[in-house]
Amino acid sequence: NAYQYFPQGTIHLAVIDPGVGSKRRGVGIRFAGGYLVGPDNGLFSGILSQSPALSAVNLNNSSYWRTPNPSTTFHGRDIFAAVAAYLARGVPLEMLGEIIDPDSLQQLAIAVLQIEEDKIRGQIQYIDIFGNLITNIPDYLLEGKNWSVQLVPKIIPAKNTYSDVPSGEIVAFIGSHGGLEIAVNSGSAQKQLHLNIGDAIEVRIDRSQ
């Protein structure tokens, strides 16, 4: 979600690359917010699910690498960093390699929301170091509505922040990431609720008011 807070035209270089040195592609991607540079292994799936790729290239033009003989274990230095620097200098994306179909980019499976008239089903997609449960349910589905989280047998009412409930109590609110968050005031929601990444979360919408 952090990409949304960067200036328009930012070049985002990201390298989580267990397949470095294999046949996986390095890619440069143009999207509405700027550019993405990194391995084609699904790393950019979350961003592209919100802001689709406008164009993409396979970074196979070695003229724009740091060296034509890159390390088999350090493409972040020898390919991706160099390409990002050339983009920053104004080199067009299309000069950096072969144009590819954006639909061919590798995508990780991202949980699909189930939306009904009075309920939304999502899941936990991240747990931070404090034990807060970050879900994939976005704020715009909840804003202006009377909602609560159903964790049988618990019903967690919507609040604004941690301190809206006593210390040790569970609270649900729209977090700083822009989506539903479940937390415990001065505690860990993960430890108290025994939930993990991928576990289902159901929100009930009260339309009687």
Where does each model-flagged region fall?
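Active-site histidine-anchored catalytic micro-motif
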Residues: 1, 6-9, 14-16, 20-78
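A generic local secondary-structure boundary/capping motif
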Residues: 3, 25-27, 47-48, 70-72, ...
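Structural motif
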Residues: 10-13, 26-28, 34-37, 54-58, ...
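Fold-independent oxyanion-binding glycine-rich loops
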Residues: 15-18, 31-32, 39-41, 47-50, ...
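Anionic-ligand-binding alpha/beta catalytic cores of soluble enzymes and soluble regulatory domains
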Residues: 66-136, 141
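A conserved acidic, glycine/proline-rich C-terminal tail/linker
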Residues: 134-194
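Surface-exposed interaction regions enriched in Ser/Thr/Asp/Glu
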Residues: 197-206
